[in-house]
């Protein structure tokens, strides 16, 4: 019985006060300000997060809010809020940034380790996004079925508040959180079933990302519990399972059954080959199981969302596919990953007889989704819908060196991210689009022609795009010749273990 309580029982010592430090502890503002400046987000060029709020302005807004009327969600005028005035959207966004920093403090590994007097083990290799793909290469070739899951986001802001209730001790911070979500829900209508998670997080990425991660954490804790204890829960109905009050009674009954040596009656469905991978709002559940059991997991996930999280069950949320002969490719983290068979003919000779042996080996393919990537380039105004490069008119005011440097950084980031592709032709097409778009942008700025500009510039622009790749290959293969390095660049895979954020052009969904 204690084993199940470890998974499901709420630890009251983990609850925290969030609104009190926001109002009365001044060091919170400095901490939030420094955290915002030190947080980096991968944009098109790998830029840093732009912190628009200062600690002094946040403190003034908090004081103004505290001295005015009590917090009220219902406002008489949609244009003027009784707390913030006409700039309610801007002020609420600034305060919510600091509120997000306060909420993140108890969950900071560095802070918890400091308070406990422990050191954080440095393992940067396990933090890289690219570390997932060697895992795919090692595991997918031995698996049969995969569940392609798009985790639903809550359709009502109250679901996010209820998820956070287990970690919050003071009710006033929950009211403040409801106020922020009410502002976003009324002004932008973000929390709707039609929008993706990227749109859901666009207005205030820091606070909503924390709330969404809390929502996903609750979902995954139940999912992992079911995976670990599925042998004990085969006869448990779903509605009884998610209600913790009735769950313990069911478990006690099952313990009595096991005590009477009736284990043979209850078949074991625990799968040791089940693998789970998630990034943002998409997850993959792969297994060597039969399609019948995988279909059961599919309907179980749908029921979990409907009954426990009150999320809408849209068609296509969970798709069951068979990993066979490259007919299905997993669209995950900007790559199309699939399993294909490689045939290898071996001639064997025994005495006077010779015969051929056909050996088939499964191999994981990782390719570039060129159609989606060109769509991202089109949306960013680097090319048209047909993939023809166009000039970047919004960058015409930059200097030549700054404009070229921007294109080189974008090309370098994409080249590094897709270095693990098994087919590089699509990647070279993307680099060609960026290179020619850079030339056309310079031509438009100087009011010249492409031929005249290239004739005057020569091969200097081309060297800017290739210099970074030659430098990386020289570090990886110092003794190899230049020809062999370029051959490996075209044929081999290179996974970088320092890529922590997905590029905006890669994240096209």
Curated annotation (Swiss-Prot):
InterPro entries: Domain_X, Maturase_MatK, Maturase_MatK_N. This is Maturase K. Belongs to the intron maturase 2 family. MatK subfamily. Keywords: Chloroplast, mRNA processing, Plastid, RNA-binding, tRNA processing. PANTHER family: MATURASE K. It is found in: Plastid, Chloroplast. The keyword Metal-binding does not apply.
């Amino acid at each position: 019985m204690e084993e199940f309580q470890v998974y499901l029982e709420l630890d009251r010592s983990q609850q925290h006060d969030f609104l009190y430090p926001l109002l009365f502890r001044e060091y919170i503002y400095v901490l939030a300000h420094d955290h915002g400046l030190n947080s980096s987000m991968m944009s098109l060029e790998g830029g840093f997060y732009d912190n628009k709020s200062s600690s002094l302005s946040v403190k003034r807004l908090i004081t103004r809010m505290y001295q005015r009327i009590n917090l009220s969600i219902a406002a008489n005028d949609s244009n003027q809020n009784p707390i913030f005035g006409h700039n309610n959207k801007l002020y609420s966004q600034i305060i919510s940034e600091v509120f997000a920093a306060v909420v993140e403090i108890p969950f900071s590994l560095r802070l918890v380790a400091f308070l406990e007097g422990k050191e954080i083990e440095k393992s940067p290799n396990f933090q890289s996004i690219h570390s997932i793909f060697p895992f795919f290469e090692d595991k997918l070739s031995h698996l049969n079925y995969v569940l392609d899951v798009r985790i639903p986001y809550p359709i009502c802001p109250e679901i996010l508040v209820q998820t956070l209730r287990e970690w919050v001790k003071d009710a006033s911070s929950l009211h403040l959180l409801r106020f922020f979500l009410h502002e976003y829900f009324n002004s932008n209508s973000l929390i709707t079933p039609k929008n993706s998670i990227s749109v859901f997080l666009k207005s205030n990425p820091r606070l909503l990302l924390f709330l969404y991660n809390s929502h996903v954490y609750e979902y995954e804790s139940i999912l992992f519990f079911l995976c670990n204890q599925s042998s004990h829960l085969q006869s448990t109905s779903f509605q009884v399972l998610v209600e913790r009050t009735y769950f313990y009674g069911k478990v006690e009954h099952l313990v009595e059954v096991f005590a009477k040596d009736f284990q043979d009656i209850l078949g074991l469905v625990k799968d040791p080959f089940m693998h789970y991978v998630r990034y943002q709002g998409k997850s993959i559940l792969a297994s060597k199981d039969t399609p019948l059991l995988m279909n059961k997991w599919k309907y179980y996930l749908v029921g979990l969302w409907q009954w426990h999280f009150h999320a809408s069950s849209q068609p296509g949320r969970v798709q069951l596919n068979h990993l066979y002969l490259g007919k299905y490719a997993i669209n995950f983290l900007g790559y199309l990953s699939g399993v294909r068979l490689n045939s290898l003919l071996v001639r064997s000779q025994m005495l006077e007889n010779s015969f051929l042996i056909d050996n088939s080996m499964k191999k994981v393919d990782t390719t570039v989704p060129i159609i989606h990537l060109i769509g991202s380039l089109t949306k960013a105004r680097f090319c048209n819908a047909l993939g023809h490069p166009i000039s970047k008119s919004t960058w015409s005011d930059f200097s030549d060196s700054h404009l070229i440097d921007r294109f080189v950084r974008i090309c370098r980031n994409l080249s590094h991210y897709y270095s693990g592709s098994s087919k590089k032709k699509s990647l070279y097409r993307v680099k060609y689009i960026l290179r020619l778009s850079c030339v056309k942008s310079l031509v438009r700025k100087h009011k010249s022609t492409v031929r005249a500009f290239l004739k005057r510039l020569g091969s200097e622009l081309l060297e800017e795009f290739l210099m970074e790749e030659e430098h990386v290959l020289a570090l990886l293969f110092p003794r190899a010749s230049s020809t062999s390095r370029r051959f490996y660049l075209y044929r081999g895979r290179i996974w970088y273990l320092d890529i922590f954020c997905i590029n905006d052009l890669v994240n096209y969904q």
